[in-house]
């Protein structure tokens, strides 16, 4: 997979793209990153990329020209047309399901904006997806783009050490993940549940599933309604939990 980031602040990506899973993914040649300062595409003599909004109002708006030229240049150099993603508060709420969808692509391109917003022609004529990571405001699109890229890259084949790791993550099954414990079994009187020390794998899996259901029900009940993996027994157990 290839991932392009169009940004005015390329230095923001240096640490993230060269650390942890993203670094390992590049070493395994599962992904390559290309960080592009789209200011370089500005046709203004001072390389200006923003201007005042027509009709007045506060803030500055990113101009269409440098973004269009950057996207067109990178797309023309690509072997396949990329999925072009605009990260913005107005976009579709990002989910694990969306991450799995994007992980099937060969080429992603993120447009990371700043200022008040984008010239609407960018949104209407360039992008294939608009994505939001939540109902809050950030200074720019760089952090959301990096978050999305991280969640996508870890789904690529052979990136994680244990291939099943991402399947067991929260949201991959439609539920929050169960609690985890490690050594020592007793820390200052705080003990690991006995079932995890029993060696009975069937009982352990049953405990993990119930804890996952319980945690999801108490913290994110909205996910229970959309979960399609519940058995009839689990539905009865949740009903009992609800009535307790």
UniProtKB/Swiss-Prot annotation:
Gene3D superfamilies: 3.40.1280.10, tRNA(m1g37)methyltransferase, domain 2. Disulfide bonds: none annotated. It holds the Pfam family tRNA_m1G_MT. Its EC number is 2.1.1.228. It catalyses: guanosine(37) in tRNA + S-adenosyl-L-methionine = N(1)-methylguanosine(37) in tRNA + S-adenosyl-L-homocysteine + H(+). Its main location: cytoplasm. Keywords: Cytoplasm, Methyltransferase, S-adenosyl-L-methionine, Transferase, tRNA processing. S-adenosyl-L-methionine binds at residues 113, 133-138. GO terms for cellular component: cytosol. One of its GO terms (molecular function) is tRNA (guanine(37)-N1)-methyltransferase activity. It is found in: Cytoplasm. HAMAP family: TrmD. Belongs to the RNA methyltransferase TrmD family. Homodimer. Specifically methylates guanosine-37 in various tRNAs. This is tRNA (guanine-N(1)-)-methyltransferase. It comes from Bacillus pumilus (strain SAFR-032). The gene is trmD.
